[in-house]
């Protein structure tokens, strides 16, 4: 990472943002995009940002890179971004050698207390912006409010995807992860051309044997469900995610950035189609909205509480008919619930 890139990264990291309180970040990103030559961008009603650079030739499609603009951390008056060195904690199935020391970025508030630096997903934003600066033909999407259910990307402008050939998100921790299934949605064809071509170049760029994983949810799953485009989510260098002691490996972010260039060099401006097949369940229906109607589902008694269950494309809503309270579970959490309820209620619960 060059010194100029590091300065840009630290400036981005110092911008406070939290789910539903993202105006400062969105305004900052608008100012950055305004200063980029050859880039056109716009903001939709959700405050998602869409940017395009370059003109396509005949039968070409844009590579698209995405990230999200919110973090889980509490807003503080000032985020002081500091440089340091650290070994890496165990992260999603990988333990790192204790003598493997990385240059890191971490954050303190004005009282010198640790505060979340927000690498999830400011690291992803940084990578998207740098790719926008350096690639000749590219699109990026920066989506709001991912952390509480991908609210921004669920309202993505589908016309923006009409000339996109593949989508790459940078929103996984560490430097060794690739998401293949997200919210129960497969992002690319198993053993298909897309993954067989990108996996070697990602591993070469990242310097790691990549682990394919299931991810609870992130924006790329929403785009996959709404399109016929192959998608992927890749590590972008943050550790101790969602804690005040979160930090970012500068080396891993730099490698992730290089992987973006390597992916475009390998795949070019082609389209890699992969159709999403919406799942169906016997004796159970899927609804597009999340509003309950009297005739949607049967009411049954569960542990002395009358509840209703309804499903949308991301998971299920459980509503207490006594208190009116609703909880939402994403698809990854639903399967254990189905099994538990089936065992608990035997034949009285149909799904």
Description of each model-found segment:
Residues 8-11, 15-59:
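A non-catalytic alpha/beta surface segment that caps or lines the substrate-entry region
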Residues 59-137, 147:
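Active-site metal-coordination/substrate-binding segment of hydrolases
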Residues 1-15, 282-295:
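N-terminal hydrophobic or amphipathic helices/low-complexity stretches enriched
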Residues 240-296, 347:
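His/Asp/Glu-rich mid-to-C-terminal helical/loop segments that flank catalytic regions of hydrolases
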Residues 34-38, 58-62, 131-139, 162-164, ...:
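Short glycine/proline-enriched coil/turn segments at helix->beta-strand junctions
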Residues 211-256:
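Zn-dependent metallopeptidase/amidohydrolase metal-coordination segment
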Residues 276-336:
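Acidic, Ser/Thr-rich low-complexity intrinsically disordered segments
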Residues 113-190, 212, 220:
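Acidic/histidine-rich catalytic neighborhood of metal-dependent amide-processing enzymes
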């Amino acid at each position: 990472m060059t010194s100029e890139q590091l300065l840009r990264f630290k400036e981005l990291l110092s911008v406070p943002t939290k789910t539903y309180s993202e105006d400062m970040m969105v305004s900052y990103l608008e100012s950055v995009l305004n200063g980029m030559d050859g880039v056109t961008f716009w903001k939709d009603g959700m405050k998602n940002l869409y940017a395009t650079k370059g003109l396509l030739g005949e039968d070409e499609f844009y590579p698209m890179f995405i990230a999200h603009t919110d973090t889980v951390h509490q807003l503080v008056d000032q985020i002081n971004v500091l440089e340091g060195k650290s070994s890496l904690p165990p992260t999603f199935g990988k333990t790192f050698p204790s003598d493997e020391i990385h240059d890191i970025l971490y954050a303190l508030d004005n009282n010198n207390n640790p505060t979340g630096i927000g690498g999830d997903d400011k690291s992803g934003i940084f990578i998207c912006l740098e790719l926008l600066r350096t690639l000749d033909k590219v699109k990026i999407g920066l989506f709001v409010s991912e952390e509480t259910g991908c609210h921004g990307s669920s309202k993505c402008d589908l016309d923006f995807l009409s000339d996109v050939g593949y989508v790459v998100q940078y929103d996984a921790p560490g430097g060794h992860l690739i998401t293949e299934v997200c919210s129960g949605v497969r992002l690319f064809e198993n053993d298909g051309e897309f993954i067989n071509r990108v996996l070697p170049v990602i591993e070469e760029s990242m310097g790691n044997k990549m682990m394919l994983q299931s991810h609870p949810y992130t924006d790329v799953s929403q785009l996959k469900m709404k399109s016929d485009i192959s998608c992927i989510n890749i590590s972008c260098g943050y550790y101790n995610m969602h804690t005040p002691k979160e930090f970012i490996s500068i080396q891993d972010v730099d490698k992730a950035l290089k992987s973006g260039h390597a992916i475009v060099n390998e795949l070019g401006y082609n389209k890699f189609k992969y159709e999403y097949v919406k799942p169906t369940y016997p004796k159970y229906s899927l609804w597009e909205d999340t509003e309950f109607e009297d005739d949607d589902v049967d009411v049954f008694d569960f542990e002395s509480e009358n509840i209703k269950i309804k499903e949308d494309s991301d998971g299920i809503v459980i509503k207490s008919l006594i208190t009116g309270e609703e909880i939402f579970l994403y698809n990854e959490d639903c399967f254990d619930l189905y099994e538990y309820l089936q065992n608990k209620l035997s034949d009285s619960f149909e799904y």
